[in-house]
């Protein structure tokens, strides 16, 4: 799934490890989502949107 997770994370100055800690997942999970190799579960997608203060559809595109 296409996403702008890396750009949003970078805009806030967060490392992959910091975002992972905020989400309660591993750094490898963040890397996999950013590279489009892993589609997050719906609950994780909601957490990602919440951390960035936006809607799921603002971060992820089908």
Descriptions of predicted regions:
Residues 1-11:
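A short, Lys/Arg-rich alpha-helix, primarily the initiator
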Residues 14-32:
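Short alpha-helical DNA-recognition segment
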Residues 24, 43-58:
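DNA major-groove recognition helix of helix-turn-helix/homeodomain DNA-binding modules
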